[in-house]
Structures are given as structure tokens and as C-alpha cells.
From Swiss-Prot:
Keywords: Metal-binding, Ribonucleoprotein, Ribosomal protein, RNA-binding, rRNA-binding, Zinc. PANTHER family: 50S RIBOSOMAL PROTEIN L31, CHLOROPLASTIC, LARGE RIBOSOMAL SUBUNIT PROTEIN BL31A. It holds the Pfam family Ribosomal_L31. GO terms for biological process: translation. Its cofactor is Zn(2+). This is Large ribosomal subunit protein bL31. Part of the 50S ribosomal subunit. InterPro entries: Ribosomal_bL28/bL31-like_sf, Ribosomal_bL31, Ribosomal_bL31_A, Ribosomal_bL31_sf. SUPFAM superfamilies: L28p-like. Binds 1 zinc ion per subunit. One of its GO terms (cellular component) is ribonucleoprotein complex. Zn(2+) binds at C16, C18, C37, C40.
């Protein structure tokens, strides 16, 4: 193997919008800002819900609902 070809790892902080701060090793070398993390993501917190924006499900069922019925 060749010597000195791998990037240097540095410990950085990844900060989430919920305020959670995570220390990780990375080659980026600068702090990261996350939108969601394991502490606030709906899948991991169990608060998962379906959001119907603008009645899209009703609009779909109105257009194609009759096709599924026999």
C-alpha cells in the first residue's frame, strides 16, 4: 500500500436544528449543520404521521378511485 495517500481524519461537531450536538470523525474538517438527526427524526422518535398537503390524497381518489372497484 502507498503511504500518505489517505485523507486526515479530524473530530468535528455536527449540530442539528433540534439542538443535539454529535461529535464525529470526518475528512471534511469543518462543522456540519443537520436538518434532522436520530434524536428528532420522526421514524426514530415514533411520532411518524402522514401529512396530506392540499388534499392530494382526496384528489387522487376522486380521479382514480373508481378504477380499483369491480
Amino acid at each position: 500500500m502507498k503511504a500518505d495517500i489517505h485523507p486526515a481524519y479530524a473530530e468535528i461537531t455536527a449540530t442539528c436544528t433540534c439542538g443535539n450536538v454529535i461529535k464525529v470523525n470526518s475528512t471534511a474538517g469543518k462543522a456540519l449543520h443537520l436538518d434532522v438527526c436520530g434524536a428528532c427524526h420522526p421514524f426514530y422518535t415514533g411520532t411518524q404521521k402522514i401529512v396530506d398537503t392540499g388534499g392530494r390524497i382526496d384528489k387522487f381518489n376522486k380521479r382514480f378511485g373508481a378504477l380499483g372497484k369491480k
